[in-house]
């Protein structure tokens, strides 16, 4: 994926917008809202056409990449039993 880090231009964190939750740039749409739609198995095309017509498919992909990077960088402290 050559554009893997391109979400950095599409996902922004602004303390004045949604209490600093990550949002899609130039919108007030939280990444969390888009991820919930993905979780409901709604296609990227339907998310753009039916829910957020101001977005592009690349914005939806950026949300998924952002979430993947957050999980990838998370430290897990599991206890072995």
Which ranges hold each PLM region?
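A short, structured beta-strand/loop element
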Residues: 6-46
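Long, charge-rich, low-complexity alpha-helical segments
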Residues: 30-81
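Intrinsically disordered, low-complexity and often Lys/Arg-enriched segments
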Residues: 1-7, 79-81
């Amino acid at each position: 994926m050559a554009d893997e880090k391109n979400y950095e231009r599409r996902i922004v964190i602004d303390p004045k917008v949604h209490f600093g939750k990550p949002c899609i740039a130039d919108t007030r749409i939280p990444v969390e809202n888009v991820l919930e739609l993905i979780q409901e198995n709604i296609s990227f095309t339907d998310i753009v056409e039916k829910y957020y017509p101001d977005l592009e498919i690349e914005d939806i992909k950026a949300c998924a990449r952002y979430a993947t990077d957050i999980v990838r960088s998370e430290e897990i402290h599991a206890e072995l039993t």
